[in-house]
From Swiss-Prot:
This is Putative agmatine deiminase. Belongs to the agmatine deiminase family. Its EC number is 3.5.3.12. Keywords: Hydrolase. NCBIfam families: agmatine_aguA (TIGR03380), PRK13551.1 (NF010070). Gene3D superfamilies: L-arginine/glycine Amidinotransferase, Chain A. It comes from Lactococcus lactis subsp. lactis (strain IL1403). GO terms for biological process: putrescine biosynthetic process. The lineage of its organism: Bacteria, Bacillati, Bacillota, Bacilli, Lactobacillales.
Length: 366
């Protein structure tokens, strides 16, 4: 049985969210199918999701959540070592609607179940309804028999922050201070909420993300912790890049920051793609009222930063771009003791996200 914990917070109970670079038990994903977000009835992106799941499963068990109508299709496409479970959903962004797990020193596992409103609710959310997505975290906790903390008064997505597991949280002002999330809360209120639910002492604020139209600037496209005291940050000197200003600002800010332990951050540069990834007019994407349209020429958020660290591996986006190999080399330098695996995820980018967005790790508690 999985219960809701009322009246206390993870910090009060001695739980913390570990860094992504710490040991993991499994990775959750959600099978894509929306024809108003994914081109050609989601068939191309289902291949990409399958390839991502295969890459992850070399290092960590994968559980794929799938709707009733897609269960048999997903089970057929995915390898036998990927567990497939039927769970209703509105779309496939488990990083944002799934649970953010926390652990304690006794080897126990719990989770944060954030309120999810499709990245902005009725202000600037990407689709409606989102009610099934908002239940995903609770259902995962039931499946895993994990007690959870529900934040009915606080909207948050897992892709909007990174933690180092040692008291530091990295996020962006563009996202967490956006009107469609928690307009009733001050910046200080939001900081306190993060500190209580992630067991943190210090919040590091970047300015803008690189996807204002999608998620209001999630940090996982811009920067992440790669080890205690070390971060990676996207970097480009190409002033024509749509990511230039945000990348330069983030890099400058990070180089001036210290973490919760007082360490000056070591900042690793990660290249941006040489060419923009864009929506093509021949893509067959359904138009549905209430869903953000994807139109010819739209620039997609193709960032190498949206990788997943999972046990002895790091799964890195690839785009068929001339900078693909450089990105893999740079990530390998950040993680000399891990295997770096590139997966072409351009089909995922067409739908507004990438590898980190479509995965959620369950840390090893013991």
């Amino acid at each position: 049985m999985a219960k809701r914990i009322i009246g206390t917070t993870p910090k009060e109970d001695g739980f913390r969210m570990p860094g992504e670079f710490e040991a993991q038990d499994q990775i959750f994903m959600i099978w894509p199918e929306r024809p108003d977000n994914w081109r050609d009835g989601a068939k191309p992106v289902q291949i990409a999701f399958t390839n991502v799941a295969k890459a992850i499963s070399r290092f960590t068990p994968v559980t794929m959540l799938v709707s009733q109508s897609q269960y048999q299709n997903a089970r057929y496409q995915l390898p036998a070592d990927v567990r497939v479970l039927e769970v209703s959903n509105n779309d496939s962004w488990v990083r944002d609607c799934g649970p953010s797990f926390v652990i304690n020193d006794k080897g126990e596992l719990r989770a944060n179940d954030w309120t999810f409103n499709a990245w902005g609710g009725l202000v600037d959310g990407l689709y409606f309804p989102w009610d099934q997505d908002d239940l995903v975290a609770q259902k995962v906790c039931e499946l895993e028999r994990v007690d959870s903390y529900r934040t009915d008064d606080f909207v948050l997505e897992g892709g909007s922050f990174h933690v180092d597991g040692q008291g530091t949280v990295l996020t962006t002002e563009m996202c967490l201070l956006s009107e469609g999330r928690n307009p009733h809360m001050s910046k200080e209120d939001i900081e306190n909420k993060l500190k209580e639910h992630l067991n943190a002492e210090k919040i590091l604020w970047l300015g803008d993300g690189i996807d204002p139209e999608e998620t209001n600037g999630h940090v996982d496209d811009v920067a992440c912790f790669v080890a205690p005291g070390e971060v990676a940050c996207i970097y480009t000197e190409d002033e024509k890049s749509p990511f230039y200003e945000a990348a330069q600002d983030a890099y400058k800010r990070l180089n001036q920051m210290t973490d919760a332990k007082g360490r000056q951050l070591k900042v690793h540069k990660l290249t941006c793609p040489a060419k923009n990834v864009t929506i093509k007019k021949q893509f067959r994407i359904d138009t549905v009222e209430g869903t953000m349209p994807r139109e010819d020429g739209d620039i997609c958020i193709a960032s190498y930063m949206n990788f997943l660290i999972t046990n002895k591996g790091v799964i890195v986006p690839q785009y068929g771009d001339e900078n693909d190999a450089l990105a893999l080399k740079q990530v390998q330098e950040m993680f000399p003791d891990r295997e770096i695996v590139g997966v072409n995820t351009v089909e995922v980018v067409y739908g507004g996200g990438n590898i980190h967005c479509i995965t959620q790790q369950q840390p090893k508690a013991k």
